[in-house]
Amino acid sequence: MAKEKFERNKPHVNVGTIGHVDHGKTTLTAALTRVCSEVFGSARVDFDKIDSAPEEKARGITINTAHVEYDSNVRHYAHVDCPGHADYVKNMITGAAQMDGAILVCSAADGPMPQTREHILLSRQVGVPYIVVFLNKADMVDDAELLELVEMEVRDLLSTYDFPGDDTPIIIGSALMALNGEDDNGLGTTAVKKLVETLDSYIPEPVRAIDKPFLMPIEDVFSISGRGTVVTGRVERGIVKVQEEIEIVGLRPTTKTTCTGVEMFRKLLDEGRAGENCGVLLRGTKRDEVERGQVLAKPGTIKPHTKFEAEVYVLSKEEGGRHTPFFKGYRPQFYFRTTDVTGSCELPEGVEMVMPGDNVKMVVTLIKPIAMEDGLRFAIREGGRTVGAGVVAKIVE
């Protein structure tokens, strides 16, 4: 069978289901593929296939994730669903599956539960920008007042973590009903169609990497006689054009220079674009004035910082992480983009130690500044071995 060509004519949006165990995330995921396959002709995926999600490795961390795709009238959605709570924690912290928006599934019969809260908090910490709510199992609730109560609780919870609780769309329905092709009182297929329409209208189209301001992490520095200094790396976002002014940020005081050439596979180009590996020739910059671990960026778009609040997942012993807990004052290396920088960890009030397999919020102080912004991912290493993964939740200074 010939492979289908991937059609790129619709905007691509990444979403995922979050919420407490057994509230119906996987059932809703399967129902979404069923309803969209009937309405918009995308492929249907069965519950069992999603539920037995394959193991993946992201940065040495084992995560079980199911990936499904479905189409609406105007968009193509890539959707992630994780079987276990630990998988969500790892997934969100490592950014293995970055979400442009999340579907919070909450059982109308049970209301918000501990993981409902934790997933909302994680979404805030790792920078999931939008949440849409699906109040599931509504066919099991006869009392309209109870539904209203649960809806209020969910809105309060969202507001607690700085999401717009009052304005968040909440769809009431039954994923199981929709999965079985039923639709009593519009709670089945109608509710799921409404959910898809809400995703279309409430989650804005993400800005593509190429439309963001230029940034390239420096991997290597060369000196070419008669030409000057060339730095190489993969352009993370944006475009760099010849004769544009750029900044060198991180590790040392920020300096300005001009890009006098872009090279790729020994060919000279006028520009380097997001996703490309290229060499950038820097005017008047000496070989020893720039190093791996710094970034080239559009002037004024990114600043160097040393202190930040982070959400961290500590690898378990089975994942090749530490065998013992660590305590406050722990000083590992933090690997940002292309380099390690030593830093010290301050644990939250009342947390004495962190065990392998835990996730924890911490404040990190680095010994050298790194070009960073909220949402930047990093690894925690000890002598080159990865022992944790984290994300910058909030820059302190």
Swiss-Prot record:
EC number: 3.6.5.3
Region (G2): 60-64
UniProt: GTP binding residues: 19-26, 81-85, 136-139
Catalytic activity: GTP + H2O = GDP + phosphate + H(+)
Stored InterPro entries: EF-Tu_GTP-bd, EF-Tu_GTPase, EFTu-like_2, EFTU_2, G_TR_CS, P-loop_NTPase, Small_GTP-bd, T_Tr_GTP-bd_dom
Alphabetical keyword list: Cytoplasm, Elongation factor, GTP-binding, Hydrolase, Magnesium, Metal-binding, Nucleotide-binding, Protein biosynthesis
Location(s) in or outside the cell: Cytoplasm
Region feature (G3): 81-84
Binding positions (Mg(2+)): 26
tr-type G domain: residues covered: 10-207
Region entry G1, spans: 19-26
Alphabetical list of PROSITE patterns matching this protein: G_TR_1, G_TR_2
A GO term from the CC aspect: cytosol
Primary localization: cytoplasm
G4 as annotated region, ranges: 136-139
Annotated stretches, region: G5: 174-176
Disulfide bonds: none
Function: GTP hydrolase that promotes the GTP-dependent binding of aminoacyl-tRNA to the A-site of ribosomes during protein biosynthesis.
Quaternary structure and partners: Monomer.
Name the UniProt record assigns to this protein: Elongation factor Tu 1
